């Protein structure tokens, strides 16, 4: 938004907890209030996702459906970007994107640029404070918002972001093996797609 370029921010609720959606809308309003180049939209994707679930009823899988929420949002972002001759801007940070790979492949990982991907999560929080982002946004427990039970990132990962950052940077960390275990599981997201090399 600070670039002065036209910026479109979207809230795309899919079976969303009301508290999560309220925070999304509050941040959208804050951006519109502070930057005249920002426009915000709420695109309700519930009915579309329900239709998707119904179509794939014989192939139900909770984890797969959770990731499908992120992929539906990614598809929506690219459609809105295409309609505006724009690009999709990512929100992933260093520990998520390059440390433990805590994102959905072809979901929230599907972006054109990633301006804060070299910042740790704790640095993103500090940056948010510096910019005057709403306190309730900064202090909200991080969550991917993909699960009906509203589980947090820490609940899924088993470590806080501060612990993950420390383990990422310190080979002697007591959490290093846990960090490495999560990283190994998700490494396929962070590496190039395997290609079968055909001999000449």
Summary of predicted features, one role per range:
Residues 20:
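Conserved Walker A/P-loop ATP-binding site and its immediately adjacent core
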Residues 1-3:
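Conserved SAM-binding loop of SAM-dependent methyltransferases across substrates and taxa
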Residues 74-76:
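A generic local structural motif
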């Amino acid at each position: 938004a600070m670039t002065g370029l036209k910026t479109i921010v979207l809230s795309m609720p899919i079976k969303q907890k009301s508290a999560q959606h309220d925070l999304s809308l509050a941040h959208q309003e804050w951006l519109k209030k502070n930057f005249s180049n920002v426009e915000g939209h709420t695109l309700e994707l519930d009915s579309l996702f329900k239709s998707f679930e119904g179509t794939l009823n014989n192939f139900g899988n909770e984890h797969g459906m959770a990731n499908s929420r992120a992929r539906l949002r990614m598809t929506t972002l690219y459609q809105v970007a295409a309609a505006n001759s724009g690009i999709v801007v990512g929100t992933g940070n260093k520990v998520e994107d390059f440390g433990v790979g805590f994102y959905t492949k072809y979901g929230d990982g599907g972006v054109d640029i990633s301006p804060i991907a070299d910042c740790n999560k704790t640095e993103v929080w500090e940056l948010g404070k510096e910019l005057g982002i709403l306190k309730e946004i900064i202090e909200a427990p991080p969550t991917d918002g993909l699960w009906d039970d509203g589980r947090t990132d820490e609940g899924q990962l088993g470590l806080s972001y501060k612990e993950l950052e420390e383990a990422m940077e310190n080979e002697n960390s007591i959490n290093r093996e846990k960090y490495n275990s999560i990283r190994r599981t998700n490494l396929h997201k962070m590496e190039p797609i395997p290609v079968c090399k055909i001999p000449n």
